[in-house]
Regions:
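Single conserved hydrophobic/aromatic residue that forms the stacking wall/gate
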Residues: 1-9
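Exposed, low-structure sequence patches enriched in small/polar residues
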Residues: 8-324
Length: 324
């Protein structure tokens, strides 16, 4: 079976599937220039249209278009701009978390850029940003990402990715009353969501056979609700008297260290250490460093693994046995 085109999930599916029961059609146009001109080595342009539906029943969910223009300069700098525009309302059949319900989604536009310097430089900073706007409910989205990279020498390099995201007046599912005998009531909320992600990647190559890699990541999300609504059968929202505190803060910290040693052709030993912390609270802390300190004092899990892969050349073994 095919989950993309089915209302049911398949036990034989592999990979990551956000939603099943989807049916999408797309139309794409490309315009590419591969020969250098002016200050540019190459120039690529994309225009794509998407028409989305449920597979069963065949219901309209959304129409959108995406554009991107990217170029590489003669200095080997990379520049890209893009936009994603949803010009007409649609419906989300998954966010209500209950079969037979839908949420009406509204017009929205998102614009972004990216700049990457020449990666041959020992020090550089990747920069990207996005701004999204939706008139209904005053929805806004701001995104900024910085990625400094340092190559100290041929053995040691370091990369730090800092990602900021602020979603203002975002709509989403909060709760529902699933008690028997009561009419189903689904509550949505208008919220402000803040995300900060810090990721540090380092790599040290001792020899052509021995290497050490370290990845440290901290993810922090804060959600504060401003208003609550009751979802209607037609997908619209009506003001609700719901007044529970649904604000929360989530912290996820991960550390992954990998030591690898290729001790023979086709043979390798790998030692891995993983450290993980997960902390969720309804208490909001606005100071990043104070929040990080609390996270590091939370309970954590450590795991260690050792893997040895040995390549045995049976042809050579049998050849030696015959000769003896």
């Amino acid at each position: 079976c095919d989950s993309d085109r089915s209302s049911d999930l398949c036990s034989s599916d592999l990979g990551f599937l956000r939603n099943n029961n989807e049916f999408s059609s797309s139309l794409a146009f490309d315009y590419d220039v591969y020969e250098s001109f002016g200050n540019f080595l190459s120039w690529h342009n994309d225009l794509q249209f998407y028409y989305n539906q449920l597979y069963e029943p065949r219901s309209f969910t959304g129409f959108s278009m995406w554009t991107r223009s990217r170029a590489t300069t003669k200095n080997h700098n990379f520049i890209s701009i893009d936009s994603w525009i949803k010009p007409v309302p649609g419906y989300d059949f998954f966010e209500p978390r209950n079969e037979g319900w839908k949420q009406k989604t509204y017009e929205y536009a998102d614009y972004g850029f990216r700049f990457s310097p020449d990666y041959r430089n020992p020090f550089l900073v990747d920069v990207s940003g996005q701004f999204g706007y939706g008139k209904k409910y005053g929805r806004r989205n701001y995104h900024l990402e910085l990625g400094p990279r340092i190559r100290f020498n041929d053995h040691f390099n370091m990369q730090h990715e800092i990602e900021f995201n602020y979603a203002e007046n975002e709509l989403g599912y909060v709760t529902d009353n699933d008690k028997e005998g009561d009419e189903l009531k689904i509550t949505f909320g208008k919220r402000d969501r803040r995300n900060i992600t810090n990721t540090l990647n380092t790599s040290y190559i001792f020899t052509n056979k021995i290497a050490l890699d370290l990845r440290v990541r901290h993810y922090w999300m804060q959600v504060e609700y401003n208003d609550f609504y009751t979802l209607q059968k037609d997908g619209t929202l009506e003001p609700s008297g719901y007044d529970e505190n649904e604000d929360f803060s989530t912290n996820i910290f991960n550390l992954d260290m990998t030591y690898s040693w290729r001790f023979a052709p086709g043979s390798e030993m790998t030692f891995v250490w993983k450290n993980a912390i997960y902390k969720e609270s309804d208490e909001s802390v606005s100071d990043y460093f104070r929040n990080f300190e609390r996270t590091m004092s939370s309970p954590y899990n450590n795991s260690f693994s050792l893997k040895i892969l040995y390549y045995l050349d049976y042809e050579q073994v049998f050849k030696n046995q015959k000769s003896s």
